[in-house]
Amino acid sequence: MDFQTLHQLSKTELHCHLDGSLSLSCIRQLAKMIDRKLPATDDELRRLVQAPADSENLGDYLKAFDFVAPLLQTKKALQLAAYDVVEQAAEENVRYIEIRFAPVFSLAGGLSLVEATQAVIEGLHQGMATYDIMAKALVCGMRQLPNTDNQTMFKTTAPLLGSTLVGGDFAGNEADFPTNVCAPAIKTAQSLGVPLTFHAGECHCPQNIGEAVRLGIPRIGHATACFDQPALIEKIVETGTTVELCLTSNLQTKAARTLAEFPYQALKKAGAKITINTDNRTVSNTTLTQEYQRYQQAFGTTAADFLAFNLNAIDAAFIPDADKKSLRDQLHQDYATYC
């Protein structure tokens, strides 16, 4: 399939970070709101908000987020940001997207956790009112923060769970804060009924994936380190865990040093529930259509595969069964021409 055909395919995305996915035009709009001076050209601005080409690890990659954080400190800014990411997704025929963000990073201007979360929800509502897309939010705990901070975040935002805020995540510095360190906050979120996904396996640490699966988390973001761990892959399949793959991001962070270290083929062969994601559209300089093209070029991924992966995403989405059925029906109809 050529790029235009891939663009036309209906898509779903479970793993997309708000602060890592803002368009350059949105960044300029947000900066103007706080009188922050930006480089005159987009090429110069892009260098500030994209991961450096010479990233050595996840830590280097995460530094790109520091530039955007000060721009997301008001309700209006968060609304605009959420709308912007929904717009980008809708323009490449994403039918369902979950956008994740850490409300704790938007408190410097005086917002509360609830206010920051509600602002993102409102931005998603505005996007859905404009475009033919279903957009949901996930709140992220940050693994480098004390468990008590993450527990407070989940306790505070859990009452907002409903039609738009649908779940939670843990992101951040995995190398220094492995899964077992986060266990108390994970268990708190689970006790509150927060559906969880969890970043694991981005730092050559398969044990973090295994521990997350053992803790009963149904979705794993990245899971890159399982590529040469057949017993772990078997456990992923056995438990029905869904994997949120992020190819471009993993190559940038060196979670996968080469395509051979990316777990797609091993997971697919084993029958694991795979999904395709951007991770961070801007930081990784990618789109979901570009990700599809990379899978097709690297692995020979077919339209039938893409349909299966999208159906996996709908099965794993934190939404009611009626919404899942509607989305499945739409996907089957949209892919009938290609499969």
From Swiss-Prot:
Q: Name one GO biological process term.
A: nucleotide metabolic process
Reaction equations catalysed: adenosine + H2O + H(+) = inosine + NH4(+); 2'-deoxyadenosine + H2O + H(+) = 2'-deoxyinosine + NH4(+)
Q: What class of enzyme is it?
A: hydrolase
Residues binding Zn(2+) are 15, 17, 199, 279
A Pfam family found in this protein is A_deaminase
User: Which residues, by range, are in coiled-coil regions?
Assistant: none
Tell me the protein's name.
Answer: Adenosine deaminase
Organism of origin: Lacticaseibacillus paracasei (strain ATCC 334 / BCRC 17002 / CCUG 31169 / CIP 107868 / KCTC 3260 / NRRL B-441)
